[in-house]
Amino acid sequence: MINYSDIIEKAWSGYDPSRKIAKIEDISPQVSTNHVYKVTFTDEDFIIAKLSSFGKYEHFKEDHRIIHATANNLLYPFENLLAKSLLKNNRVYTYRYKKGKTDAWVVFYNPSRVMQRLPRRLDDNLIKSLGRQIGKFHLACSRIRNVLPKSSKTLRTDINTLQEMLQTQEKKFGNKAQVEMLRYHCEQFLKNRNKCNAGSFETIPVFIDWNIGNFSVVNKHELYSRWDYDWFRMSSRMLDFYFFSRVVSDAGDKTVFSYLISPMMEDRFLLFLSEYHK
């Protein structure tokens, strides 16, 4: 059994051992591959810690470096939108714990201020407001894309990695028929990616896993804060659209989802897109 609190303690000791931790509380949303903790100090100040063991440490470190640069370069009204990672020696501080079969890594955040949450099911006016806001946010991200650090990850490298795993770790993916189905869809994805000339799509920072539990709004439903960066990518804004289709769907936002195409076919998502493009 992995003692996650012990890893958090070690990570903080590497950051600032002069400040003592009073308690560590698991506040994970239970819908993620990451563990999230509230770390309270003896003086009652607190921070947020994220612990992950999914993927590679190098990618985790790279992502948070790009996210920090994004947060630092976004202009009004998004200059304070993104949760800020803690820095040490002017770099995002990350910690890697490696012992036996355990390989995990940690990053610390300043807590985000949370204002209004959107309801689980949005009405037409809220869908329109959200569409306009996301359009403005994507445009703001586009304007800073040329000054951000380069990312080593793309959708193509993701698929290549999956194909390698299907070759070398076949048993992890189920029976022969299931593995063949995955191989087929990997090949179809790469073929269709070429047909669409996806390499020509503009690359911007996208935060992908949008749901009403990881962002808040103010006033005329303007974006105020966003936290929880599980699936960050430097990629096409298209990646965000599927998750917004779920947020604005007739069924409303949920904690348990199936990855179905139907939310993107709803009139409610088309309404979102029409406002987005204004």
Regions found by a protein language model. Give the residues of each.
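Active-site acidic catalytic loop and adjacent metal/ATP-binding pocket
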Residues: S32-F41, I48-A49, K191-L239
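Conserved short submotifs of the Hanks-type protein kinase catalytic core
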Residues: T102-V114
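Protein kinase-like catalytic domain
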Residues: A71, H138-R145, S249, H277
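A cross-family kinase active-site recognition segment
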Residues: R120-Q178, T203
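A conserved alpha-helical element in kinase catalytic cores
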Residues: S52-K101, N125-K128
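Juxta-kinase regulatory segment immediately upstream of eukaryotic protein kinase catalytic domains
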Residues: M1-E25
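An alpha-helical support segment within catalytic cores of ATP-dependent transferases
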Residues: I8-D16, N146, M165-I208, V218-H221
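Active-site activation/catalytic loop segments of kinase-like enzymes and analogous catalytic loops
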Residues: L239-H277
